[in-house]
Amino acid sequence: LFFTMANIALPGTSSFVGEFLILAGSFQSNTTVCFLAATGMVLGGCYSLWLFNRAAYGNIKVQYIHKFGDINRREFATFLPLVILTLVMGIYPEIWLDPMHVSVQNLLCQIQL
């Protein structure tokens, strides 16, 4: 559920920062495109929640429920760094944005924006 919520750009996750920057930049140049992009993001979020609901609570037969268990230590050790990285990128995105600043400025100068 955490990664589904991160996928739909829950504030505090890495996807929120990316989608916010995209919408802020597109709003300055073309409001119509920004509105269409925001609509697509909302529809994508609805689809992600629908997909999670189907995958997690969908068509499970009672005889197979005993085969599903909770997350084990190995799976937890796999997910924990991903969860931490997703939260760090969402809470403090400057770690990744600051090194890209010079390259983005050079690109903008080349296309004269």
Model-assigned labels for residue ranges:
Residues 1-69:
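Functional transmembrane alpha-helices
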